[in-house]
């Protein structure tokens, strides 16, 4: 089903994540994949990458770094020349943006949650756009969580997930004419 497809998968930290299960299934269906990670998590991602049915490389990507995004585009162009799809499994909020004290969250923590968990979908799409053009089409799938409910202690991450949902709609609108599909999948609570 995915024979010959080239997929970028973000967010693999352990072999217990949805992103890891996606990587396994993609390989089972014949896809060629690469993972991304950065910082302290990279060592964990590299360990998980070795447990895949076929071990893969882990590319450096801090999705908030324009330099990393540009380097990702260049490296994917060098290796593959195109990308058929990507999984956005990226989310983060500082500890003070969780925990039930929504009103006391500093603005820089709320902004960090938004930038990493929502705006990053747009940043990844911009980085991959030239590679989807080479492929003639593409798919961007993001992992979501129900943002229609004010979940206890989820706080600013819930706001970021609502922004992620809106971001995906705008990306679908703007990339649809280029044969790029943008969808979110919610794993639920």
Provide a role label for each language-model segment.
Residues 76-81, 135:
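Glycine-rich phosphate-binding loop signature in dinucleotide/nucleotide-binding domains
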Residues 49-67:
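Rossmann-fold cofactor-recognition segment
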Residues 31-45:
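Conserved glycine-rich Rossmann-like NAD(P)H-binding loop of the short-chain dehydrogenase/reductase
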Residues 2-35:
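Canonical Rossmann dinucleotide-binding motif of NAD(H)/NADP(H)-dependent dehydrogenases/reductases
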């Amino acid at each position: 089903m995915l024979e010959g497809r080239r997929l970028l998968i973000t967010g693999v930290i352990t072999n217990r994540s949805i992103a890891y299960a996606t990587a396994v299934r993609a390989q089972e269906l014949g896809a060629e994949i690469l993972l991304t990670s950065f910082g302290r998590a990279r060592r964990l991602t590299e360990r998980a990458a070795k447990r895949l049915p076929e071990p893969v490389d882990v590319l450096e990507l801090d999705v908030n770094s324009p330099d990393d995004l540009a380097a990702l585009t260049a490296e994917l162009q060098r290796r593959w020349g195109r990308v058929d799809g990507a999984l956005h499994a990226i989310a983060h909020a500082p500890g003070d943006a969780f925990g039930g004290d929504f009103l006391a969250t500093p603005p820089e923590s709320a902004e960090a949650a938004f930038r990493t968990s929502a705006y990053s979908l747009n940043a990844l799409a911009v980085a991959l756009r030239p590679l989807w053009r080479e492929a003639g089409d593409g798919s961007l799938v993001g992992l979501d969580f129900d943002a229609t409910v004010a979940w206890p202690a989820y706080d600013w991450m819930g706001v970021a997930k609502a922004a992620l949902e809106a971001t995906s709609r705008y990306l679908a609108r703007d990339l649809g004419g280029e044969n790029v599909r943008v969808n979110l999948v919610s794993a639920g609570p």
